[in-house]
Amino acid sequence: QENLILFGEKGQFVLRGNDLLTPKTVSVTPITNYDNDTGTTPLELGSYIYFPFNRGSFSGLREFTINANTDNYDSVEVTSHVPRYIPSDIIDIAGSTSENMICLVSASNTREMFVYKYYWEGNQKILSSWSKFTFPFNIRGMEFVDSDLYVVAVKSSKTELLKIPMEEKLVDDNTTFNTYLDMRTNNTYTTGNDGTITLPFTPEAG
């Protein structure tokens, strides 16, 4: 559909693309009336749009759907089974259709990232789960590129760009397993040298 979906604090609207668009004919139509946390931009993922909302001191997430055949719009909450799990005031949201995953960060604790994982079978979502990652740094931004999540991290006044592979059943090259080690880097060792390895970052004590 060539429609523009607009999100307000108290509702959702549509600007239809098949109408003649002039200053005199433009028409914005309300379609649903769900609260929206305007602290972050809604996430377009596949044929759905995800947007957070505040529930007191906690946050919820809605899955906005469009029926192209009937031009009907609806929204389903995907946090109804965990209403007191995610803190309020979401400031960033990122998602991947490759991994069926959405990540959220709240302003109340930018060291935590909440992860929504789901599985579709046809048009039916048969599995979904929420989990939480806790990091030793503050998250300032994040974005998926294919199956990798890139995170802008701040720790001890230093800003770093980190990559977190989110691919399922990921294994290391030339192995049948994956090594779970933060900040790891590849290095080629030559027999006979002093064994010094130069890291692309400055290690911290502890």
Residue ranges of predicted features:
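Short, charged/polar micro-motifs that form catalytic or ligand-binding hotspots
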Residues: E2-N3, T32
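Catalytic or ion-translocation cores adjacent to nucleophile or general acid/base/metal-coordination motifs
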Residues: D19-E63
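Beta-sheet repeat architectures centered on beta-propellers
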Residues: E2, R55-G206
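Surface-exposed extracellular loop regions of Gram-negative outer-membrane beta-barrel proteins
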Residues: I5-L20
